[in-house]
């Protein structure tokens, strides 16, 4: 199902022991944890692009403590996936949403992210899914109409590529931070709902919209994890227990 990520190639990849190879002999490593690295050298804007290991660990602790559980349940309800679905999480991070939903539903799951550290964590925790390191801002390494569902959860969006890999009538779930998300830590945010809907006007129809919010009492260590996960500078004197709002805008589209 994977395609070669070398520019101008895009031929199907086949497994050859610990690597993936295309008919033109372009080769890609399979890590010990099981993920496939398709990231091209010219696509690296930094030595280790994407989320840092520290941010990934902080986000994982927040997930494990249940602060984002209502978001996960709302996403599951919105996409209504079954075991027959083929699901792509573009910008999957540590794999929390895709991995837990796959465990519950048994669908064919594929996650892609530019951060090798994030994808490695996902592969170790959720080995039933296929995990790929690649730049989702570029051409996605999948054939046309490969997926029945695509997820884009607080990540970068690539509307034309989402449409290309999504089957006709397939579902796209886009989650963006609501204006009151983490308002106690970073102030009120911009409402990007209308702008996001406009980006998907070509090739998609908006079929549902829902805001999912909850407030939680965080101890100082959890507040620190939130700050690290959103790359805010840490000041020891300001890291104290606080009641914090977690809020997402869920936009469900159908491929036209």
What are these regions (language model features)?
Residues 138-149:
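A short acidic, Gly/Pro-enriched loop at the edge of an enzyme's catalytic core
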Residues 212-256:
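Conserved Class I S-adenosyl-L-methionine
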Residues 1-48:
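N-terminal auxiliary segments of SAM/dcSAM-dependent transferases
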Residues 65-83:
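Conserved alpha-helix/loop element of class I SAM-dependent methyltransferases that forms part
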Residues 170-180:
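Conserved beta-strand signature within the Rossmann-like core of class I S-adenosyl-L-methionine
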Residues 159-171:
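A short glycine-rich, Lys/Arg-flanked "PGG" loop and its adjoining helix->strand segment in the class I
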């Amino acid at each position: 199902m994977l395609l070669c990520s070398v520019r101008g190639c895009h031929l199907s990849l086949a497994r050859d022991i610990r690597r993936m190879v295309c008919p033109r002999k372009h080769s890609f490593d399979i890590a010990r944890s099981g993920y496939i690295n398709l990231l091209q050298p010219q696509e690296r804007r930094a030595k280790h692009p994407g989320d840092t290991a520290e941010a990934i660990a902080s986000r994982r602790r927040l997930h494990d403590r249940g602060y984002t559980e209502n978001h996960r349940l709302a996403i599951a309800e919105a996409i209504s996936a079954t075991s027959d679905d083929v699901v792509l999480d573009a910008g999957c991070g540590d794999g929390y949403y895709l991995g837990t939903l796959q465990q519950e539903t048994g669908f064919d799951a594929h996650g892609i992210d530019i951060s090798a550290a994030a994808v490695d964590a996902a592969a170790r925790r959720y080995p039933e899914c296929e995990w790929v390191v690649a730049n989702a801002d570029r051409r996605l390494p999948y054939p046309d109409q490969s997926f029945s569902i695509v997820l884009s959860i607080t990540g970068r969006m690539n509307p034309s590529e989402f449409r290309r890999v999504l089957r006709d009538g397939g579902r796209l779930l886009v989650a963006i931070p609501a204006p009151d998300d983490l308002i106690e830590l970073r102030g009120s945010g911009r409402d990007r709902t209308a702008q996001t809907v406009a980006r998907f006007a070509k090739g998609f129809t908006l079929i549902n919209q829902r805001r999912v919010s909850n407030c939680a009492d965080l101890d100082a260590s959890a507040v620190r994890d939130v700050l690290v996960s959103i790359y805010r500078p840490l000041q020891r004197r300001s890291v104290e227990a606080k009641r914090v709002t977690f809020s997402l805008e869920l936009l469900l589209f159908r491929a036209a």
